[in-house]
Structures are given as structure tokens and as C-alpha cells.
Regions:
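Short, conserved beta-strand/loop elements in beta-sheet-dominated catalytic cores
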Residues: 186-201
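Short Ser/Thr-interspersed hydrophobic loop/turn segments at strand-loop and sheet-helix junctions
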Residues: 155, 201-202
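A structural signal for short, well-ordered beta-strand segments
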Residues: 109-112, 148-150, 218-222
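Catalytic core of non-heme Fe(II) oxygenases with the double-stranded beta-helix
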Residues: 119-190, 227-234
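Non-heme Fe(II)-dependent double-stranded beta-helix
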Residues: 1-39, 43-138
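Non-heme Fe(II)/2-oxoglutarate
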Residues: 2-21, 195, 202, 207-259
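Short hydrophobic-aromatic micro-motifs
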Residues: 43-44, 148, 196-198
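Active-site rim elements
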Residues: 81-84, 183-184, 205-207
Length: 259
């Protein structure tokens, strides 16, 4: 007979839980939040310094060279090299993520993608499988995931920009998984140093790389702390940060694993 364990153990310091659900917003940030809520995306300028761009490019190249032909890292990016870690709580981005999702946030996934010359257009897709209602549930729940892309190469018509359909995060149906152009799509030509954040439920896709060079991106995605994460939050680098990092870093790395 199965023996029930009635003990409930909290194995984290409850001080890492924010005292307020939502941060105070100034007029500029409030305007950005309203834009994101309406259109489902936001372009953040000066999200990375020149030195950070150089460091990321060097680290990205070194990491994928070791992977020998692999073009995707789907999760646990921070475990591949500690030089990726500053993206975890990068201030210009976290400021906007908290403004939109509230203070109780964690990483949904930390990934990277190398699109080599000859890669094809992606089909249109959403990143989440949950159904959508723009009004949420009566209590206010809504599947909330925000993707943040740091593009390490200037996006052009040749190497493949990002295509989105602004406002489609509110659509009640998924997009057709096909390669075609929406009449109201928007093409984003991201620049190194910018961060492109977008709702995981917006219709989006990466276009094919017709250039002679690789296209490189790091993707750090966020959600509320009470949602399931793709990350394992294990491994030596993450374990060290969960032990000795800041309260925000611990929160972002899933330290509040039960309540």
C-alpha cells in the first residue's frame, strides 16, 4: 500500500518573494506597457552595451563550435557558459518584463538558435499550446509568456528578419502552419544591442537565411513564477546562483518551487 508523506517542506527563503505584485510605472513605461498589450511586441533600444555584444558573439561562437553542427539550444543556455548569465536579469529588459507580467517572474526558457545560410522560412506559429481569450478567465488568469530575442547580427532581407502579426496574440485561433505572407504582417529588422520582446502567443516566424553568413540569436523567455517552466533549473552554474545570487536571480531561476 502506498504510504502518504504528509510533510510539506518549504526549502527556500520566503524573503525572495516580492512584497508587491506590480511595480510602480512612470509615464514612459506605462506607454510602453500599453503598446505591448495592444500590439504584442516591443523593441527595446540599448538593451546591450557594445562590450556585451562582443562578449555574447564570442561566447555564442565558442559554444556552437563545441556542438559540432547543432543549430539549436532549446533550454539551459546558462549552463553552456557563465558568460550568458548576465542576460538572466538584464536591467533594461527585466524592467519591461516586470512592468508587463508583474514582479513575480521566472525564466520560462533560455535558448539560442543559429540559422545557417540556406535555412528556410519558418511556418507561422505560436509558442504556447494553451487556448486564448483576450479577456482571460473571470479571476484574471491568462497564459503569459514573453519572449526576448537578442539578435547578434543586423537582420536584413537576406539573412532573415522576424515576421509578426501585431495584435494577433488576442486571436482565438492558431495561425495556419504554412509559409505565406499575412497582409498585415510586420517585418522587424532587429539590430545588435536591441532586445525584441513579444508575447509568446503572437503569430510570428523567422524568415529564411539567404545570405552567406550565420544569423545568431539568444532567446530568454519569461513567465509568472507560478507557471511551469521548460528549464530544469539544475546544473552547477545555476545551482551556484540559486545558492548565492540575488533575490531576483533566485526568483528567476525557479527557487519558489512550491507554496
Amino acid at each position: 500500500m502506498y504510504k502518504l508523506n504528509n510533510e510539506f517542506e518549504i526549502n527556500y527563503n520566503k524573503e525572495i518573494i516580492p512584497k508587491k505584485l506590480n511595480p510602480d510605472l512612470d509615464k514612459k513605461l506605462e506607454k510602453e506597457v500599453n503598446f505591448f498589450l495592444k500590439w504584442g511586441y516591443l523593441i527595446i533600444d540599448k538593451a546591450l552595451t557594445d562590450n556585451q555584444i562582443v562578449l555574447l558573439r564570442k561566447t555564442f561562437n565558442k559554444t556552437f563550435k563545441k556542438l559540432k553542427g547543432k543549430e539549436h539550444i532549446d533550454y539551459n543556455l546558462f549552463e553552456y557558459d557563465k558568460n550568458f548569465l548576465f542576460l538572466l536579469d538584464n536591467k533594461p529588459v527585466i524592467k519591461r518584463i516586470s512592468a508587463i507580467l508583474g514582479n513575480c517572474i521566472q525564466v520560462h526558457s533560455a535558448s539560442a538558435r543559429l540559422s545557417s545560410p540556406g535555412s528556410k522560412n519558418q511556418n507561422w506559429h505560436r509558442d504556447g499550446h494553451w487556448p486564448v481569450d483576450p479577456n482571460g478567465t473571470p479571476i484574471g488568469s491568462i497564459p503569459g509568456q514573453i519572449n526576448c530575442g537578442y539578435y547578434l547580427d543586423p537582420l536584413t532581407e537576406k539573412n532573415g528578419p522576424i515576421a509578426i502579426v501585431p495584435g494577433s496574440q488576442k486571436a482565438l485561433f492558431k495561425p495556419p502552419k504554412k509559409d505565406f505572407e499575412f497582409p498585415d504582417q510586420k517585418i522587424i529588422y532587429a539590430k545588435p544591442g536591441q532586445a525584441i520582446i513579444f508575447n509568446g502567443w503572437i503569430y510570428h516566424r523567422g524568415l529564411g537565411n539567404k545570405s552567406k553568413s550565420n544569423r545568431r540569436v539568444c532567446l530568454i523567455c519569461y513567465q509568472n513564477s507560478w507557471m511551469k517552466s521548460r528549464e530544469t533549473f539544475e546544473g552547477p552554474i545555476i545551482s551556484k546562483i540559486k545558492k548565492s545570487g540575488s533575490s531576483l536571480q533566485k526568483l528567476l531561476l525557479g527557487s519558489v518551487n512550491k507554496w
